[in-house]
Amino acid sequence: MINKAILGGTFDPIHNAHINVAYEALERFNLEEVIFIPAGNPPHKIKLKKTPAHIRYEMVKLAIEKETRFSISDFEIKSKDLSYTYRTLKHFKEKEPETNWYFITGEDCLSYLEHWKYIDEIFNICNFVIFSREGFKGKEEIIKKKKSMLLKYGKEILFMDASILDISSTKIRNRIKEGKEVSFYMPDKVYKFILQNNLYK
């Protein structure tokens, strides 16, 4: 069976930690492909100001262009509807029903996972991969807490201790506003694109 993963995010901007997570997932779960999906209108970030979708899409495209096992989808940014995870996963599952799908997300999502829209359908579509920084505490407690939910859907939450740097898109945006160096946080082409388009100032 073919294994593929979806890695969604606002990617505002995409940075090296996103890339590292994708590479570690490729190796850990024997994936044929990781699909990066820039968020369109995520319901939990409606009120937050975001860089236009086509610009975020272009940055992701530049960041992953040399890796043949990475691809990008404009599924969410083409839609005017809210970007619910269920809708996105359903789209890809219907396109490739025989593929074993993984959904990669951060440890911060665990605390409210059961409140996601259509969470029961989501568990039927994919395997959850939670990436956490090395030394993340509370993993055992969370697994215990979610045990009944996992038994109900017959799926397990897979943890991946990603060797990621202390980087966040928010940190990068703030450093740019403050006139600080950020080139070492992202692929060179993304950095040049940000400079050329005078972003985040």
Swiss-Prot record:
EC id: 2.7.7.18
Enzyme class, UniProt record, top EC level: transferase
Catalytic reaction annotation: nicotinate beta-D-ribonucleotide + ATP + H(+) = deamido-NAD(+) + diphosphate
Keywords on record: ATP-binding, NAD, Nucleotide-binding, Nucleotidyltransferase, Pyridine nucleotide biosynthesis, Transferase
InterPro entries tied to this protein: Cyt_trans-like, NadD/NMNAT, Rossmann-like_a/b/a_fold
Cysteine disulfide links: none
Example GO biological process: NAD biosynthetic process
Range of residues in the leader sequence: none
GO molecular function: ATP binding; nicotinate-nucleotide adenylyltransferase activity
Domain of life: Bacteria
Pfam families in alphabetical order: CTP_transf_like (PF01467)
Pathway: Cofactor biosynthesis; NAD(+) biosynthesis; deamido-NAD(+) from nicotinate D-ribonucleotide: step 1/1
Function summary: Catalyzes the reversible adenylation of nicotinate mononucleotide (NaMN) to nicotinic acid adenine dinucleotide (NaAD).
Family recorded in the similarity comment: Belongs to the NadD family.
Protein name (database record): Probable nicotinate-nucleotide adenylyltransferase
